[in-house]
Regions:
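Non-catalytic interaction-recognition regions
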Residues: 1-243
Length: 243
């Protein structure tokens, strides 16, 4: 009542556990009947539970609710372990390693939570979430870092992105993936389903990886092809960062 009278919202969205769906259905109906706000302006954005390997809602060892700070700490520890496994830790300083670990941990948790259909439950698996392979946040992060490095090296060599032309099936697949961004963004918003956008950026990263494996990019001797592929890389990076 206070929010309606004080804020005068056009729409109110309640992002709460899907198990509360019946409760909100009743609350919204009561609010409509009381003349506070019509039901079509009230929406429950339900989400599934984060479960342990036993299939039950994830909790601390003591049985309490796990706080976000605890999740961040756990993800950071796993990310640091992952970086150590890559052999990267020996090439960078302690401060840079900590910065990269924080980025990896954040990407892992965010993507893991948003990639699922919002109302479904999922198992909390940090080993999988922090992997640099597969459908994970670190995989997308790695693709972005690789593109930035590629564009930077091209710039240092005097090469710039240019007009895009399609000369192969891998390039065609990448262009088609890029073309889906606007629709993915629109559908993700309209349906209140972030996983749609997550699916798009993952597909895009896969398409870029296929291009990277199939063709030279910065080292392409044909100038038109080189500038085209650099242009594709620039477009991919833009969508990965926006997504």
């Amino acid at each position: 009542v206070d929010r309606v009278e004080t804020l005068h919202p056009d729409r109110m969205l309640y992002v709460v556990d899907q198990r509360q769906a019946l409760h909100f259905e009743q609350v919204f109906r009561a609010a409509d009947m009381a003349g506070l706000m019509s039901e079509d302006r009230l929406e429950h954005i339900g989400f599934g539970t984060v479960n342990g390997t036993d299939g039950k809602p994830f909790k601390t060892r003591e049985g309490g609710v796990l706080r976000l700070a605890d999740l961040n700490r756990m993800a950071l520890e796993e990310a640091e372990k992952r970086i150590g496994e890559t052999g990267l830790s020996g090439d960078i300083g302690e401060e840079e390693r900590a910065r990269i670990a924080a980025l990896v941990a954040r990407a892992a948790l965010r993507f893991a939570d948003l990639q699922n259909v919002r109302t479904t439950n999922y198992v909390f698996d940090l080993e999988r979430f922090t992997s640099f392979e597969g459908k994970t946040g670190p995989y997308l992060l790695y693709a972005s870092v690789r593109i930035k490095s590629l564009l930077r090296r091209a710039k240092d060599a005097g090469h710039a992105p240019g007009q895009i032309r399609i000369e192969s099936e891998t390039e065609r697949a990448l262009v088609l993936a890029l073309d889906g961004f606007a629709n993915a963004l629109e559908q993700s918003h309209a349906k209140r389903q972030p996983h749609i956008l997550c699916e798009h950026v993952y597909t895009l990263a896969q398409a870029f990886s296929a291009l990277y494996a199939a063709h030279p990019i910065a080292n392409e001797s044909d100038e038109a092809l080189r500038t085209s592929r650099l242009g594709l890389c620039e477009a991919v990076l833009s969508q990965l960062e926006a997504g």
